[in-house]
């Protein structure tokens, strides 16, 4: 069992009132972590610690910030076993957490490489003798709110580029993966970033709303970033706007994978299975809609069903399990209701659908239409639906018939045709002949429509995590009209 204290000003500490909450393995019910439940005063203290640490961190030479972030990346990767030990909080497979650690370490390395890329520019002025500059400077305290589903990747992403840009951070840990998020903070602390540069707050589920509001409302918090559901993202966006804090929001998705009539079906099937079922479909980029040309749909469905038959979900501790657990049994109940609704309205259950507690077998449905909840609602589970259309215009219309727009994929042997189509798909990300689930630390990552706004990743995120300022230097006398 893991004890999870708060991290405030470089110190591990309990909540001020001593309260804790527990996180149990969704499969076995075993107690995984006992976690400090922060009070509003703890939230204030975390922001105050970050604010106090900001001047020194912002003043560090960029190469020194780079050195410390690189050290953190090495330590993160070296402590992979500790992260895997905490995987029981969400019922995830060890290979998923191993993948998380590798990508998160690369995110820190990429952020380290960006410390010297925070560029300004000289802008010609109409005023004689005026030297005008646009400068990017650190903002101050950045609040990162991270989810549980890819806990190492997404919590690291929430703080890596803010740190590279010279900001200090408060990480609001997920109630479902608090030990993982707290461990990230400890790794950065142990790497020598400095007391208060990274602070981690955990809270009981019932306290989440008031803790988030308190953090956003704090005048010292200058930027907010949030990854999570569209429902909660709207709340975070509204709170941030009320307090005039720019927010970067990466929200829900219902990614389409388009299979054109000339696609390599074997490649499309492999990408679809990976994109739909890896980590039990609990990824914002997960392939939820398989939009297939009618000419090849029957063959595609048959091949995908055969692939899905090899993907057994079970207890992650069982070596026979290819896939793991949902985050909890209530997620299974919710997703099963979506499946049952589709079947009741005429969809064909091709394979899967069996639910035992938090274990849901990978599911494929055909014949889904707009009358069914699965057509529009994000399942966030191991469920993919087949939508058939005749010709690429019909496929495009189906792909764009969604409130979401995060990731998408197109399979075609004609790359020119696919590229032209990709430019018309309403998504922040589109991969040709690759899966919808794909992330690299240096790439711009963000969505459109109800999937949020702004981009994480490399240069794209510098704009959000710095303040652009206009500074002038007057050389010589200046004429004034009065």
From Swiss-Prot:
Q: Which reaction does it catalyse?
A: vanillin + NAD(+) + H2O = vanillate + NADH + 2 H(+)
Q: What is its EC number?
A: 1.2.1.67
Q: Which keywords has UniProt assigned to this entry?
A: NAD, Oxidoreductase
Record Pfam families: Aldedh
- The disulfide bonds in this chain are none
The family database entries (Gene3D superfamilies) matched by this protein are listed as:
Aldehyde Dehydrogenase, Chain A, domain 1, Aldehyde Dehydrogenase, Chain A, domain 2
Q: Which GO terms describe its molecular function?
A: vanillin dehydrogenase activity
Relate the protein's function as given in its record.
Catalyzes the NAD-dependent oxidation of vanillin to vanillic acid.
Q: Which PANTHER family match?
A: BENZALDEHYDE DEHYDROGENASE YFMT
Question: What is the protein name stated in its UniProt record?
Answer: Vanillin dehydrogenase
